[in-house]
UniProtKB/Swiss-Prot annotation:
This is Cystatin-C. Disulfide bonds join 101-111, 125-145. GO terms for cellular component: cytoplasm; extracellular space; vesicle. Keywords: Disulfide bond, Protease inhibitor, Secreted, Signal, Thiol protease inhibitor. The record marks 39 as: Reactive site. The gene is CST3. Belongs to the cystatin family. GO terms for molecular function: cysteine-type endopeptidase inhibitor activity. A motif (Secondary area of contact) lies at residues 83-87.
Amino acid sequence: MARSLGVPLLLLAALVVALALAVSPAAGARTRQSPRLLGGLEDVDAQEKDVQRALGFAESEYNKGSNDRYHSRALQVVRARRQIVSGVKYYLDVLIGRTTCTKTQTNLANCPFHDQPDLQRKMLCSFEIYSVPWLNKISLLKSDCQNA
């Protein structure tokens, strides 16, 4: 009876080892990229159209809430991340600079940054923007800015 169980047990042991090696991340180099966590944060290209739309909205809200005489706009997107929820959350870390355009001017995209040292101002801001594109809804959930 011991001999009749030997072969099936050996095959079972080989199967267990093969499965362990197949699913273990430490079992050697993986050739495929790990699947993303559903609802997890992912880095995104700051130049994507939807990221730029979220950035423009965050800039607009920043300027509305600022007591500064001048508009500010993004100098650099340091990091852009996205999370798919019941819409899309964007987490943007942005270096913002003061422009030469006063708040009475409307075309912010063409405003140059101040080059006079006493008028230059840079802020490092973290924005959390929530967008529901199919409802045409966007809101700024969090904004935290520090002098850079």
